Amino acid sequence: MDLCSSTGRGACLSPASTSRPCPAPVHLRGRRLAFSPAQPAGRRHLPVLSSAAVPAPLPNGGNDESFAQKLANFPNAFWKFLRPHTIRGTILGTTAVTAKVLMENPGCIDWALLPKALLGLVALLCGNGYIVGINQIYDVDIDVVNKPFLPVASGELSPALAWGLCLSLAAAGAGIVAANFGNLITSLYTFGLFLGTVYSVPPLRLKQYAVPAFMIIATVRGFLLNFGVYSATRAALGLPFEWSPAVSFITVFVTLFATVIAITKDLPDVEGDQANNISTFATRMGVRNVALLAIGLLMANYLGAIALALTYSTAFNVPLMAGAHAILAATLALRTLKLHAASYSREAVASFYRWIWNLFYAEYALLPFL
């Protein structure tokens, strides 16, 4: 049996008088274990354990600190979960359509209706959050490749928490609409939630088919939002429903614009979509061809707006409608040259997609004054 000696340089002595280095102290569950010094010759003792002072472990293995950190990070993760660019589009679209109705009927303005209008906006944001959230839950394997910054793909939000948020948003939105806006708007709202569900959720999961996918996005973002907000606003003001030229224009324009968004959003995601057998226009036709198709559709949208203003000069603010869309068309042409110069790289098409949303916002900013 080897005995550790405290003399010399910590050698261990054996009966054969050979020496070797002492074993390093052992650590066990935060405690440092060391052998006690040997006693004088002739007396032999078993090793005893001594404890050295070490920092106490965090309660619950550090889980309290982890929970506190997750709690502090939740607002940022939740904001990313809501997809801010879609939130901005919903807010701007709702505000613009409502403002247009009020500007056309200034005598009907009643500030007592403002709380109801804000409730309607909250309901739309809840529906928006549900649709983009459910998509992240079922797209997590794709987003790990295409969009690793999203909170479900990055692990900032667990699937269980994401589910809880989605169901809460859907229930809150549907409850607000049912309690405040009547059967027609409630039906339109639940239909929008249904389309958002079948877009992402198996067994239908229509996003894997190019044509149904863009039709759903165009319907929800283009028709349902504009028609629903316009109808609800006129009903709240006590006005019968009738299409105005400007709102008819924006509904058609944004529906086509939403089609452009639907096919360009997949341009940076070709790698992940191909790996998960998702069929998009980009995977079938190629990034360059789809980008040029989207640009062509958007350019046709602008040229159509200019032609409409010149043809129906009494229905629109011609200088603004024709002039603004001519400027936006020229801006699109310049941006197309930049995209072409970048050879339609993944970074370039991702930047182009983000930039297209600025054109979308600009259209709604123009609406009240057309």
Curated annotation (Swiss-Prot):
Range of residues in the leader sequence: none
Entry membrane topology: Multi-pass membrane protein
Gene3D superfamilies the UniProt entry points to: UbiA prenyltransferase (1.10.357.140)
Transit peptide: 1-50
Name of the top EC class for this enzyme: transferase
Annotated transmembrane regions: 117-137, 159-179, 184-204, 209-229, 243-263, 290-310, 314-334
Catalysed reaction equations from the record: all-trans-nonaprenyl diphosphate + homogentisate + H(+) = 2-methyl-6-(all-trans-nonaprenyl)benzene-1,4-diol + CO2 + diphosphate
Reported pH dependence: Optimum pH is 8.0.
Notes on activation and inhibition: Inhibited by haloxydine (3,5-dichloro-2,6-difluoro-4-haloxypyridine).
Enzyme Commission code(s) on record: 2.5.1.117
Gene Ontology, cellular component aspect: chloroplast membrane
Cofactor: Mg(2+); Mn(2+)
InterPro entries listed in its UniProt record: AtHST-like, UbiA_prenyltransferase, UbiA_sf
Cellular compartment(s): Plastid, Chloroplast membrane
UniProt keyword Plastid, yes or no: yes
GO molecular function, one term: homogentisate solanesyltransferase activity
Family indicated by similarity: Belongs to the UbiA prenyltransferase family.
Protein name: Homogentisate solanesyltransferase, chloroplastic
Protein source organism: Chlamydomonas reinhardtii
